[in-house]
Amino acid sequence: MNIQSILSNKIKQAMRQAGADEQCDALVKPSGKPQFGDYQANGIMATAKKLGLNPRDFAQKVLDLIDLKNIAEKMEIAGPGFINIFLDKNWLAENIQVTLQDKKLGVTVEEIQTIVVDYSSPNVAKEMHVGHLRSTIIGDAVVRTLEFLGHNVIRANHVGDWGTQFGMLIAYLEKMENEHASAMELADLEAFYRAAKEHYDNDETFAEKARNYVVKLQNGDAYCRTMWKKLVDITMQQNQRNYDRLNVTLTQNDVMGESLYNPMLPEIVADLKAQGLAVEDEGAQVVYLEEFKNKDGDPMGVIVQKKDGGFLYTTTDIAAAKYRYHTLKADRALVFSDTRQSQHMQQAWLITRKAGYVPDSFQLEHKNFGMMLGKDGKPFKTRSGGTVKLTDLLDEAIERADKLISEKSTALSSKEKAAVIEAVGIGSVKYADLSKNRTTDYVFDWDIMLSFEGNTAPYMQYAYTRIRSIFNKTDISEEQLHPAKIQLTDEKERLLAIKLLQFEETVQIVGKEGTPHILCAYLYELAGLFSSFYEHCPILNNDNENVKLSRLKLALLTEKTLKQGLDLLGIKTVEKM
């Protein structure tokens, strides 16, 4: 259920009855402070201004027309025209009962869409590094959320599997195979790439062969395609190990690399020329966009085909948008990539729309993110200033979690301890990123992310196990709890109930905006409210059996919500810590 949506619809209906037009917005939001109610309608003043009415008079008119019987305990006008809404505790209790019985915790979807999510996108013949972390884990959290909401999600791992470098890589792979070098030498992809480049720079015979292989590959030569496919497969097998460690849902079946769109590129450039969108400029094919200006204030030129006939990333991204609409039949396409790619994506999509390749109804959304910084505020690097390999980062996360858990948890079996170390280590790296607004840069700090205090993975995982421990101390089963009635007699119970019922509106925001930090903030607030409830409202040692069972049900729904929420983020929970 979505309280915000229920209240918005009811208040908008009253606003229209009071004289507002169809486009009016109630702007209902959860209140920041208890004295302002549980929810507040903030759209009255703007609508009153449009109608030329006194905001408080209009608010009173709306208040008289709102039908919130059995939903709101009371409503009041505050300040210049806000409407404060205090929810009825019996209505809350009834909805907690319903939510607890629903496998999806009351979450529904109004309109199922087919949504393509383009994320991760590493390069072939190179190892994944920390620069791939944000796209991979933010994209995957949004994918999980959209699927939970009932949408048909198509994962698109837009890997860099094409380009002139493949001539040199194929030539070097051939050299290794001719020398009977073990495929194990490809375990270090960075070393393989460096060695290929060194041969290319220093051996003219090798370089000539590499250049020939580029042409052959682009012309579809069977041998070159086979060698190219080997490089792609070896790379993606190694990347899969990172995905599995990160508890990310990508598989090799989700690879939709740049090469997929190659057959479309000549046709797209020819069509752009035919439409008069692309013009020749110094041998290249260029689209000039009035919407973007260069430093001289003239329309910016976007190259779609180079003088030598080669295509660019822009051309590929135009083809990808067209393919996702026409072939994949998507309603919406999200691309998770660095903020520095924002202008590039906007230009590619503007050309796509100008050419009529997709309708206005097709949503193309760049979900950009900032950089991961070191404590010095500079891009995160190794001590020697090199790029941090993703596998090295995850190894260090496990080592640090091992030290942390070994100090704190002495009662765990070796199997339990290993599960906790993995959940905390990997979870800490992911949660530290996911809990930050993706559009901003963030500082990577081991001490903060592995802390059991604050908005961190260890704190959230411990909050979950703490509730599990309550149920481990009682022989009352979930089935036995089922007939018990929810009672919200204490204010802390009521506040916890409201937060539990806000799960859907939170998840809907994540699905719409692609912002997992909203879910992290919600789960952190939920854990805090449960902690306050647990301290002030006795559960197992309560003399009143009805109150005890009611509070156990609140605890059970909190446990389920924390587990489901963390799972949407791709973060594992453990039964004991």
UniProtKB/Swiss-Prot annotation:
Keywords: Aminoacyl-tRNA synthetase, ATP-binding, Cytoplasm, Ligase, Nucleotide-binding, Protein biosynthesis. SUPFAM superfamilies: Anticodon-binding domain of a subclass of class I aminoacyl-tRNA synthetases (SSF47323), Arginyl-tRNA synthetase (ArgRS), N-terminal 'additional' domain (SSF55190), Nucleotidylyl transferase (SSF52374). One of its GO terms (molecular function) is arginine-tRNA ligase activity. CDD domains: Anticodon_Ia_Arg, ArgRS_core. A motif ('HIGH' region) lies at residues 122-132. It catalyses: tRNA(Arg) + L-arginine + ATP = L-arginyl-tRNA(Arg) + AMP + diphosphate. It is found in: Cytoplasm. PROSITE patterns: AA_TRNA_LIGASE_I (PS00178). It comes from the Bacteria. GO terms for biological process: arginyl-tRNA aminoacylation. GO terms for cellular component: cytoplasm. Pfam families: Arg_tRNA_synt_N, DALR_1, tRNA-synt_1d. Its EC number is 6.1.1.19. Monomer. Belongs to the class-I aminoacyl-tRNA synthetase family. This is Arginine--tRNA ligase. The gene is argS.
